[in-house]
């Protein structure tokens, strides 16, 4: 990796810092520090995503992220999954989705997470309120379909990562203490079962911006 400095014309560390802070849509606070990793070994509340740097086309690239789940390593997820996690948790300025109807850009997001249980099924419902615009032909006429397509993509991504990696992209576990006290007390004893027993549902509410 250090050999790439000659190709880049600058130190790899400086290049990566520029990519993460000035080019990427991901906010700086999304990336954990050494201190936050140690802190989570005690707190065991957060799911953190650490960029895994490789070389692509002779330049450093991040295509996967290590997962640090409640103070323990939990394997790797691809960059798309990490991007959704950052956007869900208000740690991304703009989130782009390439859909059949066009390129959907979502920004200015806030989210609301609620917890429910019915007939033994526990759900975490994530409602994302955001601004949206479409790049491509026919986008304006398909706004309703685009919103549903975005929901479907997010729900499939969250379900796949939860089932295959036992990782929750929403960061909902850390909210249990204030929003679902009964769940919190239960999962303090068996937190390893949380991702297996809770279904995540995304709802996307878009305030459309029509570009001239």
Show the residue positions of the predicted features.
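A glycine-rich, acidic short-motif signal
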Residues: 1-212
